[in-house]
Regions:
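Bacterial N-terminal signal peptides that target proteins for export
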Residues: 4, 8-25
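Bacterial N-terminal signal peptides
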Residues: 23-34
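Metal-dependent amide/peptide-bond hydrolase catalytic core
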Residues: 40-47, 75-76, 223-224, 233, ...
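Acidic/His- and Gly-rich active-site-bordering loop/insert found
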Residues: 43-156, 176-183
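Extracytoplasmic/secreted envelope proteins and their assembly/folding machinery
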Residues: 64-68, 87, 91, 169, ...
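Active-site metal-coordination/substrate-binding segment of hydrolases
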Residues: 123-190, 196, 210-213, 427, ...
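Short beta-strand segments
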Residues: 129-130, 189-191, 219-222, 246, ...
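Acidic/histidine-rich catalytic neighborhood of metal-dependent amide-processing enzymes
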Residues: 161-236, 294-304, 455-458
Length: 459
C-alpha cells in the first residue's frame, strides 16, 4: 500500500521539494494525484508565456519583502488608519505599473474605505479582487510577521489575505515586464472591510459592484481551502434570520387549555423542528439557530449576538427570540428555503403567533458554466506551467467572500487563488511561501490568456 501524503506533500513533491504539514487540515490524505515534473510541461508555453513565468521568479524575493511589510501593518477592520496604510503600500506599486488609483472614502458605511485601481486598455475588462483588512485589531497580541523557516511564515492576515494581495500585484508586474500589461484592461478593487462589512451593505459594496459592470471575468485572491491544487468557483451565501414567537402568559398549570394555549416556547420549538424536518437534507443548504432567548421578558441587542431572558418555571412563556444564519448555494435555493421557512412560521399552535425576518447579507455565487470555463483555463495554465491539476473546492468548505457580490454581474468568476497555508483567523495563521510564485504564475498566465483569447476572437 502506497504511503498517503498530505496535499502539500504531494503537490510539493511534484515540484521536487518537501514539506511537513503543520495542521490536521494539511494532513488530509489524498493519494490519487499523479506526480508531474515542471520540465515535462513548460514546453507547452509560448515564448511570451515563458517570459511571464520568468518575471515572477525574478521578483519573488521582492514580493516576499512586500508581504512582510504589509503583514507588519495592523489593519484590523476597525483600525481605519492601518487599513489606509496597507492601501498606500499597494497604491504606489500599482501606479508604477500605469494604474490610476483612487481611495473610496468609507464614511458613508462607517469603515475606512476601499482602494480602486484602473488600467484602461484595448482588451476585455477583467476585475481583480482583494481586501486590505484582517480580523486582528490593534488589541490582538498577534501583530508581527515571523519567518519560521525558509518556506514557512506566520503572521496576522498573511493568507487572509495579504498574501493574495501580493500575488495579485506581482502577477500584474510579471505581465508588465513581459510587455503585455499595456494591452490589457484591468480594474483592481481592494476592499477595506471584508472581515467586518460596513453598513448599509449596499453602500459598502458599491465600489465593487460598480467596478464589476462590463467585466468579462473576475479573479478573487482569497486563500481558498488550504490546498494549492484547488480553486473556488462557487460560494454559499451568508445571511441571517430572526424568529419571534409570542404566547399567552398564564400559570403553568393551565398550559394547553384552550384559553391559554401552548406558549411561546412550544411555538418556537415547533417551528425549529419543522425547519429541520423539511430542509435539513437539502444539499448545500444550512441554517443554524445560534441564539435562543425565551421567557416572560426577553431583551436582545440589534446584532443578535447577545441578550437576556427572565421567566419562571411556573409561568407560560410569553416571548421567544431566535437568531440564526442561513447559507445557500444559489439565489434560487435561497428563495425556496425562505419560502418554506415562512410557510412553516405562518401556521401556529393555539394562542400563539410568530414572525420571521431575513437579512440576505452576502449573496451566493453559484457554480455557473462560465465559472467552470474559467476554472478550466486556470487548470490548463497550471498544467502547462508544470504545476499540476487544479480542481474546484466543495462549496460546503468555501465561506462567504466579497467575490460573491459580483456573481450575476460578471459571467466568469474564480476565487481562492491566493497564498496557501492554514489556521487563518487564528494566532497560528501560517503561509507556505513556496506557493507564492506558484499562484502568481498561474494568475498571470490566465490573465494573459484571457486577453489573448479575446483578441483572437475579434473580427
Amino acid at each position: 500500500m502506497a504511503h498517503c501524503r498530505s496535499p502539500f506533500d504531494r503537490f510539493l513533491a511534484m515540484l521536487n521539494v518537501s514539506f511537513r504539514p503543520r495542521s490536521l487540515l494539511a494532513a488530509t490524505c489524498l493519494c490519487t494525484i499523479p506526480a508531474l515534473s515542471q520540465s515535462q510541461s513548460t514546453t507547452k508555453l509560448t515564448a511570451v508565456e515563458r517570459s511571464i513565468a520568468s518575471a515572477v521568479d525574478t521578483h519573488n524575493a521582492e514580493a516576499l519583502g512586500l508581504l512582510e511589510r504589509i503583514v507588519n501593518i495592523n489593519s484590523g477592520t476597525l483600525n481605519f488608519a492601518g487599513v489606509r496604510q496597507v492601501g498606500d503600500a499597494l497604491r504606489a506599486p500599482l501606479e508604477s505599473l500605469g494604474f490610476t488609483t483612487r481611495w473610496v472614502d468609507g464614511a458613508a458605511f462607517h469603515r475606512a474605505g476601499h482602494l480602486v485601481a484602473e488600467h484602461p486598455g484595448p482588451g476585455p475588462k477583467i476585475l481583480l479582487i482583494g481586501h486590505l483588512d484582517t480580523v486582528f485589531e490593534p488589541s490582538s497580541p498577534f501583530q508581527r510577521f515571523e519567518k519560521l523557516n525558509d518556506s514557512t511564515a506566520r503572521g496576522p492576515g498573511i493568507i487572509d489575505m495579504k498574501g493574495g494581495d501580493v500575488i495579485l500585484l506581482y502577477a500584474l508586474r510579471a505581465l508588465k515586464d513581459a510587455g503585455q500589461l499595456d494591452r490589457m484592461n484591468i480594474v483592481v478593487v481592494f476592499d477595506g472591510d471584508e472581515e467586518e462589512s460596513g453598513t448599509p451593505l449596499v453602500a459598502a459594496r458599491k465600489a465593487l459592484t460598480d467596478a464589476a459592470k462590463g467585466a468579462t471575468a473576475a479573479l478573487g485572491f482569497e486563500d481558498g481551502a488550504a490546498d494549492p491544487r484547488t480553486a473556488v468557483i462557487s460560494r454559499r451565501s451568508a445571511g441571517s434570520w430572526d424568529l419571534k414567537t409570542t404566547g399567552f402568559p398564564a400559570h403553568s398549570s393551565q398550559i394547553f387549555k384552550p384559553e391559554v394555549g401552548s406558549g411561546a416556547v412550544y411555538e418556537a420549538a415547533r417551528i425549529l423542528s419543522e425547519f429541520y424536518t423539511k430542509l435539513s437534507k437539502e444539499p448545500y443548504l444550512t441554517f443554524n439557530p445560534g441564539l435562543v432567548l425565551g421567557g416572560s421578558l426577553v431583551k436582545s441587542d440589534t446584532t443578535g449576538t447577545e441578550g437576556s431572558a427572565a421567566g419562571k418555571r411556573n409561568v407560560v412563556a410569553e416571548h421567544v427570540q431566535v437568531s440564526g444564519d442561513i447559507r445557500t448555494l444559489s439565489p434560487e435555493q435561497q428563495e425556496r428555503a425562505k419560502k418554506t421557512m415562512q410557510e412553516i412560521v405562518s401556521h401556529h399552535l393555539p394562542k400563539t403567533s410568530a414572525t420571521i425576518t431575513f437579512d440576505d447579507g452576502y449573496p451566493p455565487m453559484a457554480p455557473t458554466e462560465g465559472n467552470k470555463r474559467l476554472l478550466a483555463m486556470f487548470d490548463r495554465a497550471s498544467r502547462d506551467l508544470g504545476l499540476g491539476t487544479v480542481v474546484a473546492v466543495d462549496p460546503s468548505r468555501a465561506g462567504a467572500a466579497d467575490v460573491s457580490f459580483v456573481a450575476g454581474i460578471v459571467p466568469m468568476i474564480i476565487d481562492g487563488i491566493g497564498l496557501s497555508g492554514h489556521d487563518d483567523h487564528s494566532e497560528m495563521e501560517t503561509a507556505d511561501l513556496r506557493t507564492l510564485p506558484v499562484q502568481t504564475k498561474r494568475a498571470a498566465l490566465v490573465l494573459y490568456r484571457l486577453n489573448q483569447g479575446a483578441r483572437r476572437s475579434q473580427p
